Amino acid sequence: MNAYSYMLIKNPDVNFEGITINGYVDLPGRIVQDQKNARSHAVTWDTKVKKQLLDTLNGIVEYDTTFDNYYETMVEAINTGDGETLKEGITDLRGEIQQNQKYAQQLIEELTKLRDSIGHDVRAFGSNKELLQSILKNQGADVDADQKRLEEVLGSVNYYKQLESDGFNVMKGAILGLPIIGGIIVGVARDNLGKLEPLLAELRQTVDYKVTLNRVVGVAYSNINEIDKALDDAINALTYMSTQWHDLDSQYSGVLGHIENAAQKADQNKFKFLKPNLNAAKDSWKTLRTDAVTLKEGIKELKVETVTPQK
């Protein structure tokens, strides 16, 4: 996603000089506006939403020590029969869990807003792109064969980018040998991406101006379309994590209810039966953190930087 946004930001507006679009005088302006809209969305991702995503994931990952401290305090309170400390610890922890869920939900809303805007523009851009191709073809431009080649190269680039990402995920596997296998996958992906670069450069060269125009518009559309797909994946992952926060809060809410009932007993071990509940909640937290680490690893190449879009 970062690579696609970078290309959109850096690419200049398509130039229709010398191209006659009979019957569709407004089409060049619409396509230029499509490209500007796509670039604007890419800038929003690069300067705002990306940082918010990284901050949210970092917050989850770094919360691990705080969670462990809460857990140890609550276990000690159970062992000593200290109901007040146990209630206070769980209440404070629930407050922080609810705050983290709120952050995740805010991020989901930002991503959804961006995705919805991009989705609208993708449909408009796609329609205008198809119309342009039809017009150029009718004017004698050999766009069919060139378009097929363009789609093949872009498809290969997307495939190896995904393969590279999958390889990093395999490298994090705990099973013996998986890091080596993941390293091989990443190596293969990068090797093939390197081989595709000359082909992409060749496709950017001017052979026939009408064909080149079709290429520029096609690549811009492909980039914004891939960002749209990537946002869907990010929203799904964060929605799942938000649900995990909610489930974790519910687990501790249940523990609080048990404390009230058990507090009436005189037995010092009256809270011991809550240990399995705490352990289950801890397991849920570890799963949530692992998911955050995995998502963070998947986008670790993202760097929040100042970008200067082309005019």
From Swiss-Prot:
It is a single-pass membrane protein. Its main location: membrane. The chain crosses the membrane at residues 168-188. One of its GO terms (cellular component) is plasma membrane. It holds the Pfam family Bacillus_HBL. InterPro entries: Enterotoxin_cmpnt (IPR052785), HBL (IPR008414). Coiled coil: none annotated. The keyword Membrane applies. It is found in: Cell membrane. The keyword DNA repair does not apply. Keywords: Cell membrane, Membrane, Transmembrane, Transmembrane helix. This is Uncharacterized 34.8 kDa protein in hlyA 3'region. The lineage of its organism: Bacteria, Pseudomonadati, Pseudomonadota, Gammaproteobacteria, Enterobacterales.
